[in-house]
């Protein structure tokens, strides 16, 4: 099994897709870091110009942001779920001001978390799809599966070795994302920020903000928590991608199907949020990070435990289908 897994890892590396993914990550992280730094510098210049040359003060900007949020929260026409999400941000900003913690100045730790929060539902899953979509389908399209199955090795072992290799490469990819996001953003911001405290554990109960379970942790701990959730989501996406790769003999079709599912799922949760079955679709459960911040939930009845169980069910079902179909698939065609 070890030699089979090593062989599959070498196959993935020889395709040079990991190099392509790293290059894409480097470009996106650099652009986003530069954009955030540029926006921050512009805000400082704007503040100093409007205040008649008064030096930049993060507390003044935070207070201004706080006033804007309180004005929005007092709007009687917004949904109570949205108001609860705004109230959560108000509580956090008040805590930062009272404890002299700067929440505005960008740091590597803040960028790290923001990058995962924004990319966990589409961008990062697409990278996993690029990595894994042709894992099995390419063997069938190039007819190399016949050579692979001539060995005295059971089919399930061959597929298991591919899956183990995929898990290893997915784990490496998540690690690369963390390293690139940290180092590149630090080059722009010149601050790590991992020792800063952050309040987390907010949740929505029947549209109302519940802060009874909030805890104070460092940004380093919070970053580890965020990346743990990202790793779990990535493994689920990898499992589903493996299933599609087994079911479809063409790698381009596999990528197309998965891209359509990821993009289409984003539309489903906003335009068909009242349809009860939508919350069981894997795409609507990918954003696990929103449960840590108490963000607005577009679909009622969803929680962190619900999403983890739903995604786990999708992963297990995908593996069952993958092994069942692969063991019975006709390779003579």
PLM regions: where:
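Junction motif at the cytosolic side of a transmembrane helix
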Residues: 6-15, 240-247, 312-333
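Short hydrophobic, aromatic-rich alpha-helical segments embedded in or entering the lipid bilayer
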Residues: 276-294
């Amino acid at each position: 099994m070890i030699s089979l897994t090593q062989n599959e890892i070498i196959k993935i590396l020889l395709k040079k897709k990991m190099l392509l993914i790293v290059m894409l990550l480097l470009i996106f992280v650099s652009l986003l870091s530069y954009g955030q730094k540029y926006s921050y510098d512009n805000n400082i210049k704007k503040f100093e110009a409007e205040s008649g040359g008064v030096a930049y003060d993060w507390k003044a900007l935070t207070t201004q942001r706080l006033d804007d949020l309180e004005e929005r929260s007092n709007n009687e026409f917004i949904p109570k779920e949205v108001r609860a999400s705004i109230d959560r941000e108000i509580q956090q900003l008040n805590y930062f001001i009272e404890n002299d913690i700067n929440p505005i100045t960008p740091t590597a730790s803040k960028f790290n978390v923001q990058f995962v929060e924004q990319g966990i539902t589409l961008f990062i899953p697409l990278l996993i799809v690029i990595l894994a979509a042709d894992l099995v389908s390419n063997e069938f399209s190039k007819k190399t599966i016949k050579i692979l199955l001539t060995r005295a090795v059971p089919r399930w072992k061959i597929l298991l070795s591919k899956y183990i290799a995929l898990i290893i490469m997915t784990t490496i990819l998540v690690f690369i994302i963390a390293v690139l996001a940290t180092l590149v953003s630090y080059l722009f911001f010149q601050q790590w920020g991992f020792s800063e405290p952050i309040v987390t554990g907010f949740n929505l109960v029947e549209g109302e903000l519940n802060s009874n379970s909030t805890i104070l942790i460092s940004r380093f701990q919070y970053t580890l928590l965020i990346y743990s959730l990202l790793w779990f989501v990535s493994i689920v996406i990898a499992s589903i991608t493996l299933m599609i790769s087994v079911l479809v003999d063409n790698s381009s079709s596999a990528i197309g199907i998965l891209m359509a599912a990821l993009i289409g799922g984003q539309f489903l949760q906003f335009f068909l949020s009242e349809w009860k079955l939508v919350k069981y679709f894997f795409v609507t459960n990918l954003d696990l990070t929103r449960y840590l911040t108490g963000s607005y939930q577009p679909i009622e009845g969803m929680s962190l435990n619900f999403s983890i169980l739903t995604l786990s069910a999708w992963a297990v079902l995908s593996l069952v289908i993958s092994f069942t179909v692969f063991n019975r698939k006709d390779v003579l065609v």
